[in-house]
Regions:
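Short, Lys/Arg-enriched N-terminal segments with co-localized hydrophobic residues
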Residues: 2-20
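Bacterial N-terminal signal peptides that target proteins for export
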Residues: 22-33
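Hydrophobic helical h-region of N-terminal Sec-dependent signal peptides
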Residues: 33-41
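C-terminal motif of bacterial Sec signal peptides marking the signal peptidase cleavage site
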Residues: 42-46
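Domain-level detector for secreted/extracellular nuclease and nuclease-toxin modules, and
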Residues: 48-338
């Protein structure tokens, strides 16, 4: 005759099952959310029927002479998002993919755009991430976990290094930071896609609570966020950020002989307000050392200077006369905190 189980044993087993089911649902929801995010990116990357011209909360349509604007074509999937103000000129050689990550809601951006990436399929590396900063992207949501994932929807297995979900010896450095996307969980989680990452030294990308040191890249990101916090409801900051991957002299190494580690990182920044346009850029070598005492002003340059250093034509969708003026002019006095 079997010995009846005590109530305590039954309770323990039921509690164990409850915990297991809770964990299962937790990860199931994560993967479901990830799949939905990637499907959103795929749908709008490949489709050319949507209207993406202009800015998130500005009309921004190019209505003046513009010889170097991005033109939707078969090569880029007739993607009208490439006409947005934050976009630089697309690379015309090699195999590239422009991936536009979108949200299911258009409450934050009229086209639902979160951020966009130019991915070099030959180098298996991201060249840049571009995005907008305005009141619509700011909120109270903060990252819950470091849930990094590959974009297996938009990239084939031979277009990214699948064995490097972790960057040995380096941080997985966000190019569009999760801290710039706090209005919703959806937009924040999207920033953890690996196409938005570059290998960065922790002393460049991180911080030390004990010593109070902050990485130079983190300080630049924090300063950019402070500028965005001061925007009025109708102002926008347009950003294009990335690391150098196109020249061997601008690469530190390749992890495992494969994954590129950029030697330099940059930010091209364009602010549109009631006073008009203002532009500036950051350029810095990535080093494995705290540089807390270095001023941000030391690394601030004009957009025109950054274009010479990177070979990238930033904010090409602006009218030519506006672009020329804003890129050559850098006035530190209008950028508080430098």
């Amino acid at each position: 005759m079997p010995i009846p189980r005590s109530p305590k044993i039954r309770v323990k087993r039921l509690f164990k099952r409850y915990i297991q089911m809770k964990q299962y649902h937790k990860y199931a929801l994560r993967y479901a959310a990830m799949a939905a995010l990637l499907l959103s990116a795929l749908t709008f990357t490949a489709c050319g029927g949507d209207d993406d011209e202009g800015d998130g909360n500005q009309s921004g349509q190019v209505d003046k002479k513009n010889k170097n604007a991005n033109i939707p074509s078969a090569a880029n999937g007739y993607n009208k998002a490439i006409r947005r103000t934050e976009f630089p000129a697309l690379k015309k050689t090699g195999k590239q993919k422009v991936i536009v990550y979108r949200m299911t809601s258009t409450s934050y951006d009229k086209d639902g755009v979160n951020f966009s990436v130019e991915w070099d399929c030959d180098k298996r590396s991201q060249r840049w991430t571009c995005y907008q900063m305005h009141k619509g992207y700011s909120g109270k949501y903060s990252r819950e976990t470091d849930f990094f994932f590959f974009d297996t929807t938009n990239l084939n297995s031979n277009e990214y290094w699948g064995e490097y979900k972790y960057f040995p010896g380096y941080d997985r450095g966000h190019i569009c930071p999760s801290g710039d996307r706090t209005a919703s969980k959806e937009m924040n989680v999207q920033t953890f896609v690996m196409t938005n990452m570059q290998p960065q030294y922790h002393k460049f990308n991180g911080f030390d609570k004990k010593t109070g040191d902050n990485g130079l890249w983190v300080r630049m990101e924090n300063q950019l966020r402070k500028w965005a916090d001061k925007l009025s409801a109708t102002d926008t900051i347009f950003v294009c950020k990335g690391g150098t991957i196109d020249s061997e002299t601008n690469i530190i190494t390749r992890i495992g002989g494969k994954l590129i580690v950029p030697k330099y990182f940059y930010m091209a920044i364009l602010r549109k307000s009631s006073f008009g346009y203002a532009g500036m850029a950051f350029w810095s070598e990535q080093t494995n050392a705290w540089r807390t005492n270095e001023t941000l002003r030391y690394h601030a340059i004009s957009i025109a200077e950054l274009e010479k250093l990177t070979g990238i034509d930033f904010f090409c969708n602006l009218p030519d006369d506006v672009e020329a003026q804003v890129e050559k002019t850098f006035n530190p006095s209008v950028w508080s905190g430098l």
